[in-house]
Amino acid sequence: MKKTFNFLLAAGLFCISTVVWADNSQPTAGTELRPSQKAMQARAGWMKEMNTNLPTMKYEEVAKSATALASQTEAAGKTHPNPLGKDLTLKVSSLATATAEAAGKKDGGTAKMKLTEIKATCDECHAKIRDKK
């Protein structure tokens, strides 16, 4: 009887802890990403795609990612409330446009140089705005 009770108690605790753990792993309103975080993740994804596709000479894919980055940053930059953030975001947009043009011409050297400039601009923005907080 005592062994049965202990087994049922252990099984019950296991089931309850599993349910509680599973419930905690679901995203809540407090853990959802803010719109700016979603935008930054998209930008990071496009940068990763370009850095992956450029060495393999997939220029069409590089141009596609650069165009997406350019249009998203242009739209965000026009309404950015911080003047420095606005300037840096629009700079990323113009560099991404130049990257797309270079990729369209299959000019890997220029595209790589522009990607390096985009990364430097991102780092500058993070240092002066995001990480400053």
Sequence positions of predicted segments:
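Bacterial N-terminal signal peptides that target proteins for export
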Residues: 1-9
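Basic side chains
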Residues: 2-3, 43, 130
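Short, linear, compositionally biased motifs with a strong N-terminal bias
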Residues: 10-14
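N-terminal signal peptide c-region/cleavage motif recognized by signal peptidases
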Residues: 15-18, 22
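Extracytoplasmic c-type cytochrome modules immediately beyond a signal peptide or single-pass transmembrane anchor
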Residues: 22-119
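The canonical Cys-X-X-Cys-His
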Residues: 118-130
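Short Cys/His-rich "knuckle" micro-motifs
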Residues: 133
